[in-house]
């Protein structure tokens, strides 16, 4: 329930409010399931979906760090590691071990599953930004270079989805939503 109180910087399409972490995680998980055929490699979709659902759970304690916040990114790892230890310690040992391992796998971004989960983490807010006319990028002064730096990592999980992302970004550059 606490995840519903943590607001991301991205606005929900047609709702005039920011998305919360629970919505972000759910959107990612359902997108992963629906888009799994576009993963670069065969993936265990259950593992991907669980990664999607838990990847931001540490923000209950650590708070949300905006993807383009250079200062916040400096302390993000330490804050999130402490939060992970506290939150997962509430679980029975077997579940703590399983979810901690999946969380660490997501963070390391070295397996087909974690790379595809990261692709969903990149794609999902981009889709919301696209649906709100690039408003969040304009509001926060985000440049095309910043978005491409983040989105280039999507290629590791899905080259096909990156092609769609590139088309969306080129459209927003033409429209002046990204400089």
Question: Predicted segments — roles?
Answer:
Residues 2-5:
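Short, small-residue-biased leader/transition segments that mark boundaries at the very start
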Residues 93-134, 145-150:
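Histidine/acidic-rich helix-loop-helix segments that form or flank divalent-metal centers
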């Amino acid at each position: 329930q606490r995840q519903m109180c943590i607001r991301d910087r991205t606005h929900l399409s047609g709702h005039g409010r920011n998305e919360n972490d629970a919505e972000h995680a759910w959107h990612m998980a359902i997108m992963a399931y629906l888009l799994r055929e576009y993963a670069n490699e065969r993936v265990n979709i259950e593992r991907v979906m669980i990664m999607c659902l838990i990847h931001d759970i540490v923000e209950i304690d650590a708070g949300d760090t905006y993807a383009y916040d250079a200062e916040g990114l400096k302390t993000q790892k330490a804050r999130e590691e402490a939060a992970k230890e506290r939150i997962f310690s509430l679980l029975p040992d077997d579940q703590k071990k399983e979810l901690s391992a999946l969380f660490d796998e997501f963070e390391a971004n070295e397996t087909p599953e974690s790379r595809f989960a990261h692709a969903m983490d990149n794609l999902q807010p981009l889709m919301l930004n696209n649906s709100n006319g690039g408003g969040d990028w304009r509001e926060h002064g985000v440049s095309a270079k910043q978005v491409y730096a983040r989105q280039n990592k999507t290629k590791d999980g899905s080259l096909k989805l990156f092609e769609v992302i590139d088309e969306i970004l080129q459209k927003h550059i033409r429209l002046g939503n990204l400089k």
